[in-house]
């Protein structure tokens, strides 16, 4: 995720002039709230992408932690002379960014530049501003493949109104790979020698391509 997000951020800065950046969270416990409170202060919007889904939870795990940090920073701003959380920044009005939460990779989907671009576009002034969304998933297809699929989709929409709007796609999917680079995708079943096969494949490609 991070390497892809960094490349997309560079692309959006160069082609659209957007002021976007990437924060790589490498530790979950103890949660680095003090560092995040400094990094996020004054930003307009923050999107947190997580490769999981918890439909019955208030927030996804990292989004929940970040929201708690922002809330504590706001509490510091209420009583600046006696901050209840001195290890965190003090947020005044306008310091708190809008928080967005995105789920990606569901159904073993690869995260393409299109998905990350969609997450950024969602936050822009003319974006959809969906607070919680799923990247690159068409819950309801605009053009069903078959009449049966159309009937099935209608049943889904009747049971879950608004489900179509949960999916977000970007307006483009640029090829941001380095020149002459190739990608290899390896599928396997657990317990069938996937690790050894993957290592052998990597060594073979290295010997062939250098």
Residue ranges of model-derived segments:
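Peripheral docking tails and interdomain loops at the edges
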Residues: 50-166, 170-171, 190
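Phosphate-binding P-loop
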Residues: 176-180
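Hydrophobic/aromatic beta-strand patches that form the interior of the parallel beta-sheet core
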Residues: 21-23, 47, 100
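Anionic-ligand anchoring segments at beta-strand to alpha-helix junctions in alpha/beta enzyme folds, i.e.
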Residues: 1-26, 182-210
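Short acidic loop-to-helix transition motifs that present clustered carboxylates
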Residues: 25-33
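A structural-propensity feature for long, helix-poor, extended segments
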Residues: 33-56
